[in-house]
């Protein structure tokens, strides 16, 4: 039915559209809904939420994060957004998605208005169809329906196309909005309607009444009779913007209606510092009016009237009038596919116009500084990088009181908001700082032979030698939750490996992170590489950071399994090092020592239950049930107040069992433990492979053959024999500290220290060598001789 409305416009409304509207309003089951709308509603995943809404009353929002509070919103749809690529007809799928997003926001209690193009394109299609119908049969057969574009069609006057297309365009909008129980109303205006005071009052009153009745006004310039543009002033000489196109119309409408937000959708990502498509063009995230001189404009779009310069002029005028503005791409949304709702949710989409000059560098600028700073860091001598890390270790102990005071502020603000395990992670202490300093000095000692180490030397041919050497990965983004002690650890590893570093901590640790970052930069300053480590503003969304694929080479999440999964999902194009879960197992064999078991279980589960290497599932050999050893384990867990969850097999052995576990694949992160029964070591291995996360798994036994079988067959990053799961840690492994624990199977696995932050490059030194010299009749032959690797002096 939409295709009929789209084809014939408003005239055949009674014949084609009315029966469908009637059947949808009374919900007759035998009526078929339009395929376009049915498809849109089936894939829709826009969250229907209610947020606190407030009018800005003439003052624009200062930050993107505030846009979610916008109540009155104007969405301007450019010609390139609503029309097809052939400039003849509308992009129905794109338009349906836009209507859906506007409807969702309207149903949240917002007041939505549309300024739309498309009447000319709609009318052009209808008039071309009329020309085809006016042909003779012979002409029609000769040209063919699919060759309509190649016909000798006279140039169609834009005003005539607009007149022919307005009714059909509005009928299409009505049909789409009806699916969301929303009414739409059309308003056609010209520049004179804004210059005549009486007409302005009438327009203003009409729009307010429509909004009051929960109707979406659809506004367009009356292109059928549009007069030439007026000067940019009203009758009293006050500076206004003349309605020359829909960009200026949207800005004028937004200011007249005291709108909170104006969204201008075009066919480009936003405002660039140079014409899009040029090699050095960079998208401007936040545009401050004072930066206008730094922008170079290109040509306008294929079908638009104004181009980017007109959009920026209109946006700045609206901003001056108290309306926040975002210019974004409405043709190929880059985030979730829902550009309008993404903008309202405060996501980094397009260019946000703000009267508040950004405080400090943008995250893109921080990425560039980390890149250049990291390259400078990599060129330092190993002794200089070690000196920086030693100085940072000294600062952690010398500035202990200031660090603990900042951490106390974080703890006070987090009290009652964070769960006890997270509060424990957030807390710093003198002993933690001392351990940090010791770990940093270990990193400094190991950094002497890291960057530039020769791994392989090969003589390819005479006077042609190849070397493989270690080099930094580039720029690392480390995202961590509630762990301020993670900051100096990761910073030291990045310094030792010559990597640039972006740090994104949780807002719950803002005070602690700030002082620790200042101390890190103070240490870096002794060799002039202060910018190598950057602390990203807490306003930056993690999802936005994960899209900076041109600035970030590796993402390392440190936090909950949900955080890791979210980052792995969002980071398209950037490798992620980490583990999504830490489901660690301990298998107690039938030949386990009674004296060892309780010590190992207590340490693995109770020493630090919030850690990712804490024990989560205890596997017991069935022969140990109802034995003193089993009773001893249970008694110890009761004393430690550990809540026990029974696995299915374990529950079947008990008359009165603890609560049966909901899932055998659970990371508790607290004093909770799953106990399950297995038949033998192979059964334990099968259980671990089915329900584990390939993190850390342990066997407790006195049988060496059984232990070796377990060690060789369990496919996890860390596999231990008669040792606590808590040893799975970079510091305890002698790595100095760890940047994280990886369960992936490439590059790095297990606790990742300094070595995991390095990659390699190949250096080939020759003397006028060319490949043709090695052909069948060439003068040279390949030798491929392995050469000794020189030992570096690390004293």
From Swiss-Prot:
InterPro entries: AceGlu_kinase-like_sf, Ald_DH/histidinol_DH, Ald_DH_C, Ald_DH_N, Aldehyde_DH_dom, Asp/Glu/Uridylate_kinase, G-glutamylP_reductase_CS, G5K_ProBA
Subcellular location per the Swiss-Prot or TrEMBL entry: Mitochondrion matrix
Catalytic activity: L-glutamate + ATP = L-glutamyl 5-phosphate + ADP; L-glutamate 5-semialdehyde + phosphate + NADP(+) = L-glutamyl 5-phosphate + NADPH + H(+)
SUPFAM superfamilies: ALDH-like (SSF53720), Carbamate kinase-like (SSF53633)
Subcellular location, principal: mitochondrion
GO biological process, alphabetically ordered: citrulline biosynthetic process; glutamate metabolic process; L-proline biosynthetic process; ornithine biosynthetic process; proline biosynthetic process
Key word DNA-binding present: no
Annotated CDD domains: AAK_P5CS_ProBA (cd04256), ALDH_F18-19_ProA-GPR (cd07079)
Binding sites annotated in the UniProt record for ATP: 266-267, 305-311
N6-succinyllysine: residues carrying this PTM: 311, 347, 550
Cross-referenced PROSITE patterns: GLUTAMATE_5_KINASE, PROA
EC number(s) recorded for this UniProt protein: 2.7.2.11, 1.2.1.41
Biological or metabolic pathway of the protein: Amino-acid biosynthesis; L-proline biosynthesis; L-glutamate 5-semialdehyde from L-glutamate: step 1/2; Amino-acid biosynthesis; L-proline biosynthesis; L-glutamate 5-semialdehyde from L-glutamate: step 2/2
Chain sites annotated for binding substrate: 117, 223, 246
Family: In the N-terminal section; belongs to the glutamate 5-kinase family. In the C-terminal section; belongs to the gamma-glutamyl phosphate reductase family.
This protein's name: Delta-1-pyrroline-5-carboxylate synthase
Organism: Pongo abelii (Sumatran orangutan)
